[in-house]
From Swiss-Prot:
Gene: IR6
Superkingdom of source: Viruses
Pfam families in UniProt: Herpes_IR6
The protein's name: Uncharacterized gene 67 protein
UniProt organism field: Equine herpesvirus 1 (strain Ab4p) (EHV-1)
Region Disordered, annotated ranges: 238-272
């Protein structure tokens, strides 16, 4: 192979490598990183001070705290020692209903050459999951074994466990997240000592497999898991945004944004 052929092969490899890198860093057009609640506080402070918002940026915001309404949520413990008890969901997580898309299986006895037909399975009865939005705009799901495990950067779960009061209304509800806080009572200390993990909860890193909200669902207050798309953030460049003062006193604060970098700016939804 002469020098010209070697140069051409090297150039072709470099072009392919750059195209692959852009493809990994690109944000699919049907996905959107919903703006965080902290970013809206900064935007509101800037608008109140007379600063105009840059053109092309989203003004609507997905506010997970609108789903919480200031109440506490409880989640069933899934660790064997705590089975049958409940733990309080940490602050910042909001309930998300299970998927409403039924599973489909091919109908048996299909003749070759015919159009495939499917049979829909009934939706399983799944309790609500809890999601939290990070400062970079992505979402994470509450760990499956919470409160035995929790993410880094969050407060360590308390040792308190709860049970559903027998005299509570809808005590036999299949989904404890729909019950009010008054329906739960703390487990007595004498029993709690026997079911508490003596080694303490385990801290785990935030996974790279996270979720982003599909375009259009950021306008809804109550969402299902159909509104989220799982992504691997290992191939994404995420811009962190600081949490501004929740009670600004007329001070002008810089507008913070969360977005995914992409080569084409039109394919990159910017969140304010």
């Amino acid at each position: 192979m002469n020098s010209d052929m070697m140069t051409a092969a090297t150039a072709g490899t470099e072009v392919f490598r750059c195209a692959l890198a852009r493809r990994r860093n690109a944000n699919p057009p049907h996905l959107v990183l919903a703006p965080t609640f902290a970013a809206a506080a900064a935007g509101g402070a800037a608008n109140s001070s007379g600063e105009e918002a840059p053109r092309g940026e989203r003004k609507h915001l997905f506010n997970p705290f609108g789903c919480m309404l200031g109440r506490s949520y409880f989640r069933r413990c899934r660790e064997e020692m705590n089975e049958g008890y409940f733990a309080k969901v940490p602050t910042g997580y909001f309930p998300v209903a299970p998927s409403e898309v039924p599973c489909r299986v091919p109908v048996e006895g299909v003749v070759a050459g015919e159009v495939l037909s499917y049979s829909a399975l009934p939706l399983p009865k799944i309790e609500k999951r809890f999601y939290k939005q990070l400062n970079d705009g992505t979402f994470v799901r509450l760990p499956f074994l919470y409160p035995e495990v929790y993410y880094e950067g969050e407060e360590e779960p308390a040792d308190e466990r709860y049970y559903i009061r027998a005299d509570a209304a809808d005590a036999s509800s299949a989904d404890p997240s729909t019950l009010p806080e008054e329906a739960f009572a703390k487990v007595p200390p004498a029993i709690a000592e026997g079911i508490t993990n003596w080694q303490g909860p385990k801290r785990i890193p935030i996974p790279s497999e996270r979720y982003v909200m599909k375009l259009g669902f950021e306008y809804q207050l109550h969402v299902t898991e159909d509104a989220f798309q799982e992504v691997n953030t290992s191939f994404m460049r995420l811009d962190l945004q600081s949490s501004p003062d929740p009670h600004p006193r007329g001070a002008r604060q810089p507008r913070s944004r969360a977005h995914v970098s992409a080569e084409n700016p039109e394919d990159t939804p910017v969140a304010v």
